[in-house]
Amino acid sequence: MTSALLEDLRWRGLIYQETHPEEMEALLNKESVSVYCGTDPTADSLHIGHLLPFMTLKRFQAHGHRPVVLIGGATGMIGDPSGRTDERTLQTLAQVQHNVDGISKQMEQLFDFGTENGAIRVDNKDWLGKIDLLTFLRDYGKHVGVNYLLNKDSIASRLETGISFTEFTYTILQAIDFGHLNKTLNVKLQIGGSDQWGNITSGMELMRRMYGEVEAYGMTVPLVVKSDGKKFGKSEGGAVWLDRTKTTPYEFYQFWINTPDSDVIKFLKYFTFLSKEEIDALETSVENEPHLRLAQKRLAEEVTKYVHDESALEEAVNITDALFKGDLKALTADQLRTSFKDVPQAKVTTTNLVELLIEAGISPSKRQAREDITNGAISINGEKVQDVAYEIVATDKIEDEFTIIRRGKKKYFMIIH
């Protein structure tokens, strides 16, 4: 019998590599399984590059399995060489703990805790931190061959550029994690990104050598690559964070709504819990009425709601609608700052509109500035102004601090007073 979960994962293209597919499928059909996915606290927030493996873990929870979320308070102090060409900078204990705390809070939004198959959050510092050097070398290191490690892509790719003994031992630490969780929480499956295959299989091999035959499986999700070949997960402003103080819900929503037609269906499969029927209907919409961008809107709505909440989604949609209509008065000062933080800014001293347009570099000359005004091309805070003698007044200064000028349909400028 085919597992409904695995059938869904395969349709979505979420299984990149897996160990013993038939045995794993039989296990998932037979019982509720504890499944784990981990991350190292390299920052105090996850970013969207972390989403795919954790959302895949969430799909296991939706099908009755128990997710175990590991935050690497110990491994985060060492540094994973996977996917790296250089050595990581070691973090202080205080910085790692700060990052662990930040990511732990985000997990509460991503998973259901306290239910019958509620998620369990663990920190590998709780067990790795208790292993002394001699125990590590005798009880674990004895079971790991150096040649075995040298054949791992994460290590082999670093041999020419150099790798420290610290990072060389990383895969052993993650292998210990899998064995510990298997023994203490009956974890039988580990999920990770495609770069984690070597670490996952190392855990299975260590368990086999230490305990004999153990029921343990591994699965990786694909590396997310955009249709233009560029790396997924970054906007022009850098990483897209799950922390709303680093990336606002509006910016987060905008990242997803700007997904090109060539990627949107794949992303709907990867990053939403919509059914096959809904996604098929949206695919038809992309083919027949792409100008409506229904698929992009649904993608942005679903991911924003999942990562943040309904109220954050509502605010993001309201800002988007207000900007589209040019109704800036519908937005608060904070919303305007967020919306226009990337537009050109200019500090001006004059209050005369014509002089302001020149001083701020909005219009190239007095003649052009006057033409722009009389032709209705200039708006102040969303209101069209066609008086060439217009003077900026106190009510034009939002919180007595800034004014938003628009020239034409899409060119915005922030004037600082």
UniProtKB/Swiss-Prot annotation:
GO terms for biological process: tyrosyl-tRNA aminoacylation. The keyword Cytoplasm applies. Pfam families: SYY_C-terminal, tRNA-synt_1b. Residues 351-417 form the S4 RNA-binding domain. GO terms for molecular function: ATP binding; RNA binding; tyrosine-tRNA ligase activity. InterPro entries: aa-tRNA-synth_I_CS, aa-tRNA-synth_Ic, Rossmann-like_a/b/a_fold, S4_RNA-bd, S4_RNA-bd_sf, SYY-like_C, Tyr-tRNA-ligase, Tyr-tRNA-ligase_bac-type. It comes from the Bacteria. It catalyses: tRNA(Tyr) + L-tyrosine + ATP = L-tyrosyl-tRNA(Tyr) + AMP + diphosphate + H(+). CDD domains: S4 (cd00165), Tyr_Trp_RS_core (cd00395). Its EC number is 6.1.1.1. GO terms for cellular component: cytosol. ATP binds at K234. A motif ('KMSKS' region) lies at residues 231-235. Belongs to the class-I aminoacyl-tRNA synthetase family. TyrS type 1 subfamily. NCBIfam families: tyrS. Catalyzes the attachment of tyrosine to tRNA(Tyr) in a two-step reaction: tyrosine is first activated by ATP to form Tyr-AMP and then transferred to the acceptor end of tRNA(Tyr). This is Tyrosine--tRNA ligase. The gene is tyrS.
